[in-house]
């Protein structure tokens, strides 16, 4: 099966025309567009192929979690778009596991400091609300969602499958962090150290976004791929508009 892989298209800043390839499935690994825009874009440019869609953090900007989950999941019903949040999709002999993931805020081994830093510098915790009370979305909320997603992923990966692709928005390893940000104190809000987790379960491919620089490397037998377009000022970052990977 051939996968056409994208993340961080950010169509709220600049439109993206989907190129035709020989892919069997399109993967959108988060931050396609804020609110409902990413889903609406995916419907408008559909190339007759099934699309797998997960939320990033930006989908929730000026929206509420989990209300937007319910809204966008409903928008995908009856379309070629499969919305995943702690959900599994089987296509042929390939099992696809998808979730936003968020992070464990433990990349540097100091969760309280990471919570404080993320709360101060990340727009996630300024622009996202929680429904139904519409209180502020906090780093501890993201951490709780992460723990639930990891628990679900682990239970899913324990079940054998011919081929497995994991899709998350947040990065599963510090190896995905661009060199210029290697020591940034906000990194715990971008990546978790799931290297041992990946080594234990060895899915075939782990696709992520959130970083606005491409990544393509292996952890054991698992290929880690990030193909982000990023913001307009980042165009030229190495993004491949027609990236197709076979699993």
Map each language-model feature to its residues.
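Binuclear metal-dependent phosphoesterase catalytic core
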Residues: 79, 178, 184-204, 211-247
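Glycine-rich phosphate-binding loop signature in dinucleotide/nucleotide-binding domains
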Residues: 20-21, 91, 158-162, 202
